[in-house]
Amino acid sequence: MKSWFSKTFPEYKKLPKSGKFMVWLTFVQGLVWVVLAVIQSVQGLINNIAWAVFFGILLFVLGVLALSAAWNAFKFRAVGFKRMTYVYMPCLFQIVFVGEAFSFTYYIESVLQLSFSLTVHKLTFGINFAAILFIVLAGRNYRHLKMVSQNTDKNVEPLEQGQETQS
């Protein structure tokens, strides 16, 4: 008896291990962003803070994009991995400026992060290396799916790096 997941996403088995990891990571990322968007927007409405509502809407859009990318990748579509690159691009940088009169912060968290920040006087600039890794993995899986889809023989898939041929 097949499970609901196997019936809905039969092509999932064709994904390489890095593709499966990226699909689940992006799915969790989308869920986290949608939940945070709802909380942020409700809090902004209660406290009458327009920027909180705007940031909640931005997070909601990013969450829907992440869920769309995961859905398409579960369905073994290359467009899912292409969208994953757009999902993780806003997570690359962290910029914080604290001045006498005002402060500015740009930072969108990803589910997994490994960041390095440099602070000079009142300015902090950070890079999330995990987001760079996720973008690279999404790009590799996108190229892999494009190669598989361009292959004329549907039963033969290109070998992943490190796989051996069976004789």
Language-model region placement:
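Topology signature of small-to-medium multi-pass alpha-helical membrane proteins
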Residues: 1-167
